[in-house]
Design a protein with these regions (language model features):
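A domain-level signal for the mature, folded cores of soluble proteins
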Residues: 2-106, 123-223
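Short loop/turn segments immediately following beta-strands, especially the blade-tip
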Residues: 111-117
Length: 223
């Protein structure tokens, strides 16, 4: 196969181009307290397929309301109706809800439509952040989440570093039956990415108040 010449499928912006995303291709969060939540997260309880999940995410984002990515590895794929040119400045903004002491750093990946088919199936590149190459950063981290055996239970997980744990069920705050995405039919699923060295700590000493300090630069939802 002959690769097309660089820039063949470049789509310059014009007067009708949107300033924001144009299409959501996939929404796959990790389990978490906001996943499937009918009250604060806007789920309907009938998101049973990946297509339902995409429709949910598009509806929320069109209304400029957040979507949760859950625990580690959750992701959303958004596309634009034009190419975003790298001018060496700030060309892309991702809004979050962080505040001082509550940063949840999200790593950003970008892709250009090299084959011109309009799908997110070309080469992805991770944008560098302040922790890239730092001691404690794990570049090829993978975590597997397991479907709870019954409603109201924690979500168990294991990773490729030999660790295991759980995402606690916090029914007093988020009482939906499951924190495991309803539209994921498999009994387990694995998410991959770069894991930063954790900075969060229990300021209360009893687990009631956790502080999540920010990282220097390069991450979404990072104060």
């Amino acid at each position: 196969n002959v690769c097309p010449e660089e820039g063949t499928f470049y789509r310059p912006s014009n007067s009708s181009s949107l300033m924001t995303w144009d299409k959501i291709y996939e929404y796959t969060p990790a389990p978490g307290q906001f996943i499937n939540d009918l009250k604060s997260s806007g789920f309907t309880g009938s998101e049973y397929t990946p297509e339902d999940a995409v429709s949910y995410a598009e509806r929320r984002l069109k209304d400029k309301i957040w979507v949760s990515l859950g625990g580690f590895g959750g992701y959303i794929i958004a596309g634009f109706d034009h190419s975003v040119k790298n001018n060496g400045e700030y060309e892309l903004a991702i809004s979050g809800n962080s505040f001082d002491g509550s940063s949840e750093p999200g790593i950003v990946w970008v892709m250009q439509d090299e084959n011109g088919d309009g799908l997110p199936n070309d080469t992805w590149y991770e944008l560098k952040g302040s922790e890239t190459g730092a001691a404690g950063t794990i570049q090829d981290y993978a975590i597997t989440y397991y479907r709870p055996a019954a409603s109201g239970m924690a979500v168990q997980w294991s990773d490729n570093q030999g660790n295991s744990g759980q995402i606690d069920y916090l029914g007093q705050f988020h009482s939906q039956e499951y924190y495991y995405p309803l539209w994921i039919s498999e009994e387990s699923y694995t998410l991959r990415g770069t894991k930063l060295l954790e900075r969060n700590y229990d300021a209360s000493g009893n687990g009631s108040y956790w502080v999540q300090p920010h990282y220097d630069w390069g991450y979404a939802d990072n104060f």
